[in-house]
Amino acid sequence: MKTIEFDTNFDKKLWTLMVPIMVQNLMLALVAVADAFMLGGLDQNYMSAVSLATQIQFIQNMFLSAATAGLAILGAQYWGKQDIKALDDIFALAIRICGIVSVLFFVACAFFPRYLMLIFTNEPVLIDYGVSYLKIASFSYLLTGFSQCYIVMMKISEHAGTAAAVSSITVLINIMLNAIFIYGAFGIESMNVRGAALATLISRVVELMLSITFSYRPGYIRLKIRELFARNKELSADFMRCSGPILGASLVWGIGFTSYSTFMGHMGTDAAAANSVAAVVRDIICCLSAGISSAAGIMIGNELGAGNLKRGKAYGIRMAKLSFLCGAVMTVLMAVSAPVILHFVKLTPQAAEYLKQLFGVLAFYMIGRSVNEIIINGVFGSGGDTMFDMYSLAVTMWGIAIPLAVAGTYFLNWPVVVVYACTCVDEIGKIPWTLIHFKKYKWVKDLTR
């Protein structure tokens, strides 16, 4: 009877957390879909330029994700322990860090957009469109970090549904404004890439306003001004111990992952366009593993923080098994969606052929992505075991994938699909190493004081 009750609780918790988080991630990914299809419907170069320009926000998110991951790891454990004072302190610390990061990226994008675009492409037309986008979108980068902190607090405090609702409303507003500003409507002239940037900015303002408003409802954690200017040395040290390795891993992974777009950008506009569409489809399908990963981190973290180490370990083992099933489902979704996307997207014949080949590579990539995301980000992260991600990425991505892609792009003139496959090999090659580390159970740890 005890086993049945345990299974029921596990499944109920998993679905309660996974579905709203997956919906939230899906809604966020749909913004990229809207940008790609609406801009791509006007001009392939619009789509490619925005895809490259948003790599700047991707880099910003590496820093923000380190702060919010520290908030999620410690927050989930202290919520399990029901220590609200510690939660307030951690929340304020994350807000301070995200605020500094947001200002730095705003300045870079607002005042030096052309230099940033030159990192990703040498095509003048893509650079010009990207600069137009960044000059407006840079203002939204001021707000993103604050919103993410509020969203994470909702997730770990049993309000994942509210977080999903906020994201859904924001995305719907973004998509509607995209249609109005990109194409032109209600007396507004077509703004193409500038319209996409303006829609993003307005939706970010709405997202932050909704997040702050919900935080004042009973049962929610809100930012307390006095905590914003106070400092708990012990919690700050714990936060840095969790976030430091995550930031290192984010930089190792994020800079490497961004370089993948650089390789495609330097292989011509057709390759860049195919990569833009493939990235959008990949991100949508990966919402499934991201949802399970986030749910795993919260569920296991709650148990570990409450002192239930045995149950937390059992949850982790089940999540590891689930990661393979999730990967198989994602592979099927990739294979099924490929012909549908190819039918609707507007590309040159060469870009369409490239895209077909990239989809084939991604079908195999999904297994590795699922296993590593759920086990490393979810299970390992729940107990503060955050170092593995950084050094495994340093070896598989920077030691194998990137050197191969650099050689193929700049020296050996390999076909686009071969270079793209090189950028995906790290996720597959890392699986055995991840499973060996999992069996050491270093992640079964109570981090609370």
Per-range role (PLM):
Residues 16-35, 136, 170, 203-207, ...:
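Transmembrane helical elements of multi-pass membrane transporters/channels
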Residues 27, 31, 60-64, 104, ...:
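Residue-level hotspots within pore-lining transmembrane alpha-helices
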Residues 26, 30-48, 117-124, 180-191, ...:
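Helix-terminus/linker motif at the lipid-water interface of multi-pass membrane proteins
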Residues 1-21, 75-142, 188-244, 300-366, ...:
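Short alpha-helical transmembrane segments in multi-pass integral membrane proteins
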Residues 6-37, 41-42, 55-70, 74, ...:
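N-terminal transmembrane alpha-helices
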Residues 21, 25, 36-37, 54, ...:
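Transmembrane alpha-helix boundary and packing residues in multipass membrane permease domains
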Residues 68, 137-156, 163-174, 196-212, ...:
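Short runs within selected transmembrane alpha-helices of multi-pass transporters and secretion channels
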Residues 47-110, 144-163, 261, 274-338, ...:
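Small-residue-rich hydrophobic transmembrane alpha-helices
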